[in-house]
Amino acid sequence: MEEGITRIGVSLPKNLLDEFDRIISTRGYSSRSEAIRDAIRTYITEYRWLESEKGEIVGVLVVLYDHHVKGVSDLLIDLQHDFHEIITSSTHIHLNEDQCLEMILVKGKMERIKVLVDKISAARGVMNVKLISAVKKV
């Protein structure tokens, strides 16, 4: 084993692993490990960007979630009320029988928006959260 490499074990739902394997095969990765390293690097880069942003921004928070997970819809509504001072509007889209997409337009201090992102990201049933910073307020 190469020095500096640590072997880990990860438990994943079968459907998630199957989809991941399909994608890495399509993209031509030589191994699952390399694809996981690439995914982790991407996650770290996005996290560092989120942490480095400061000041006032305008953007959209895109949230993909499984609405069958008990309480997730109510939690998202409650959070939007709790953060009403930075949320200008939201749009809810039913993607299929299981998944919904919420687009939340935000405007305000990045520090406050980060708190919202973290709370939504940690919610059970939320599958993906992406903050797209459209412009910095001048």
From Swiss-Prot:
GO terms for molecular function: DNA binding; DNA-binding transcription factor activity; nickel cation binding. GO terms for biological process: response to nickel cation. SUPFAM superfamilies: ACT-like (SSF55021), Ribbon-helix-helix (SSF47598). Pfam families: NikR_C, RHH_1. Keywords: DNA-binding, Metal-binding, Nickel, Transcription, Transcription regulation. Its cofactor is Ni(2+). Binds 1 nickel ion per subunit. Ni(2+) binds at H81, H92, H94, C100. Belongs to the transcriptional regulatory CopG/NikR family. Homotetramer. NCBIfam families: PRK00630.1 (NF001884), PRK01002.1 (NF002169), PRK02967.1 (NF002815), PRK04460.1 (NF003381). Transcriptional regulator. This is Putative nickel-responsive regulator.
